[in-house]
Structures are given as C-alpha cells and as structure tokens.
UniProtKB/Swiss-Prot annotation:
InterPro entries: Creatinase/aminopeptidase-like, Pept_M24, Pept_M24_MAP, Pept_M24A_MAP1. Removes the N-terminal methionine from nascent proteins. The N-terminal methionine is often cleaved when the second residue in the primary sequence is small and uncharged (Met-Ala-, Cys, Gly, Pro, Ser, Thr, or Val). This is Methionine aminopeptidase 1C, chloroplastic/mitochondrial. It comes from Arabidopsis thaliana (Mouse-ear cress). One of its GO terms (biological process) is N-terminal protein amino acid modification. The gene is MAP1C. A divalent metal cation 1 binds at D189, D200, E327.
C-alpha cells in the first residue's frame, strides 16, 4: 500500500514535478531536485509519444470518473487492529528498520502469504461489469474470515479495504460503483494485518480483451519489479534497485514514477525509503540480512505528472495515459531476497 499525499503538488518544467511528499510508501520532507543523468534518446521519446497517442486514440473506454462510494465496512471486535485505525491522521513514518526476530519472521510470512492469497482471489474477480466496490467487499470478507485486518481501512481515513486503480489511475484508487469494462487494466493493492504484522502486495490485472500496448506496459512493469528484487541481498546498496529498474523501463521508452518503496513489518510504513528511480541523489544505504521491505515500481506510457481527485486519495496521470504497478514484500538474506508475498 502507498502513503497518502498530504501536500499540494506544483507541476513545472515539462514532465517534472516538485511534491513535498512522495507517495509510494512514505513521505520525505524535502523538495525534489531537478532530474539529472542521461536523457532518453530522442527515438525512445518519439516512440513513447506515438505509443501514447495510439493508445488514447484506440481507447474504447471513456476516461475514468468517480463512482459512488459505499459506506465503510465493519470489522469484528475480536480482530486485532493497527493503532492508526482510531485516528483519521496519516501515521508518521517509523524511523525503525523492520528486522523481525525468528518468531516475527514466522508471523510476517503468514501475513504476507495471506495478502498474496487474497490478491490472487481478487484477481479472479476481474472481469467486465464487476464493480471495484464488489471486489473490495470480497477482499474485506476474505481478510476478516482469516482473522486479519485489511490494512488500508482507516489508514489516514482511507474508506476502503483495498486500493483499486484502473487505467490512468496510478494508485490509491478508492473502490466504488464504477463497473470494470472490457479493455481496462486494474491494479489491486492488498495489505493485511495479521498477528501484529503487515503483508503488502499488488498486481496489475487485465480485464477482458486488452490491447497490445497495455499488455506490454503491464509485462514490463512486472519485469521491473523482478529485476529490482534480483539485486537485493545483504550488503547491497539500495541505489542498485533504482538503477536496474530505470534502465529496464527506459529500454521500452516508459517513464518511471519517482515514488518510493518502504520498510514494512509491525508497522505498515517505515524506513528505509527506497527510491525506485536512478536519478535520486540521497544518502547511501545498504541492505541488512533479516530486513523486510516492499518494492513497488509504477510505469507510465506518457507523463508522470499527476492530478489528485477531490477525494484526496485518487491519483491519475495528467495526460490520461495508462499506468501499471506491481509490488512484493521481500526478506533480505545473505545470498539474495526471499519474496514473502507469494501464495503457497
């Protein structure tokens, strides 16, 4: 799950923006500096623009609009709830690294496996005419049946148990009465709180007959996540993640959203804040055995500029271009990384 934006956004200098708060997991208290590094080749830029134009021209579905949001669902009293549920304020990001002990790792794995199972189930519901509200209700019911709490519910006032982000929605989509349509893509972001630990994962699903350009965007985004995980191990630099993800996205002319992954464990969002774009100059940090965190790249065909809807959660691309995202929670080992959010 991603972190709520709580500051206004100013768009400037083409496709650059300078938010005071970054979203993918945790806020930072600085204004971004201009992008640096090598620019994409003109051929890739032209290809990307042409692909976006073609995608929008071939689009059979209208732009995303807000539907009706149903009342918040209840959770049985016996289910353990995160502390933030009692407050509408977005929790502070914990500065404590998430390094569970042996008992904690067992609990963490159970939470992550449940999140993965719930996500797999949610994916089976993706088809034309199903509403995202129906998906939310199904996810909510499955989570509480397993004695867990749906982590998004009540996080900073978020009204639903899952995030459903369709087409140009980059993240934080609130489930509502809008039915899915043939040709849509939808990211479903599931996080659960079980026995004191959070598991966090997401995937972009295809709804019906999806055109080739969207299929490729989804495929490359998933590959970016896999490549990011492939460089993770004890002692590795976090900067390697952004470098390999950005390089793979650039090969296809996609824009890499400049948001961040985060530590996860007994709290939903903690240090380290993991930049998934190679152009950030920040203090060098290294991974530690036993550490748990998420990686969650977001790719767009067009701009990474975005617009926040009046609900203060839903984030859509400014040009209406599609976006895709994938996310896993991983555990750092001496030789690599164990993906925890995989269902057995």
């Amino acid at each position: 799950m991603l972190q709520k934006i709580s500051q206004s956004i100013s768009l400037c200098n083409g496709d650059q923006f300078k938010p005071l708060i970054y979203l993918a997991g945790a806020p930072t208290n600085f204004i971004s500096s201009p992008l640096s590094g090598k620019k994409k080749s003109s051929s890739l830029r032209i290809k990307r623009i042409q692909q976006l134009q073609s995608t929008l021209e071939d689009r059979i579905n209208p732009p995303l609009v807000c539907g009706t949001v149903s009342p918040r669902l209840s959770v049985p009293d016996h289910i353990l709830k995160p502390l933030y549920v009692e407050s509408s304020k977005v929790p502070e990001i914990s500065s404590e690294l998430q390094i569970p002990d042996s008992i904690g790792i067992v609990k963490m794995k159970k939470a992550c496996e449940l999140a993965a199972r719930v996500l797999d189930y949610a994916g089976t519901l993706v088809r034309p005419f199903v509403t995202t509200d129906e998906i939310d209700k199904a996810v909510h019911q499955m989570v509480i049946e397993f004695g867990a709490y749906p982590s998004p519910l009540g996080y900073g006032g978020f009204p639903k148990s899952v995030c459903t982000s369709v087409n140009e929605c980059m993240f934080h989509g609130i489930p509502d009465s809008r039915p899915l349509q043939n040709g849509d893509i939808i990211n479903i972001d599931v996080a659960v709180y079980l026995d004191g630990y959070h598991g966090d994962t997401s995937k972009t699903f295809l709804c019906g007959d999806v055109n080739g350009s969207l299929k490729q965007l989804v495929k490359v985004t998933e590959e970016c996540l896999e490549k990011g995980i492939s460089v993770c191990k004890d002692g590795a630099s976090f900067k390697q993640i952004g470098k390999i993800i950005s390089e793979h996205a650039a090969k296809y002319g996609y824009n890499m959203e400049r948001f961040i992954g985060h530590g996860v464990g007994t709290v939903l969002h903690s240090e380290p804040l993991i930049y998934l774009h190679s152009n950030y100059d920040y203090e060098l940090e290294y991974m530690i055995e036993g550490q748990t965190f998420t990686l969650e790249p977001i790719l767009t065909i067009g701009t990474t500029e975005f617009v926040t809807w009046p609900d203060k959660w839903t984030i859509v691309t400014a040009d209406g271009g599609p976006a895709a995202q994938f996310e896993h929670t991983i555990l750092i080992t001496t030789t690599g990384a164990e993906i925890l959010t995989i269902s057995s």
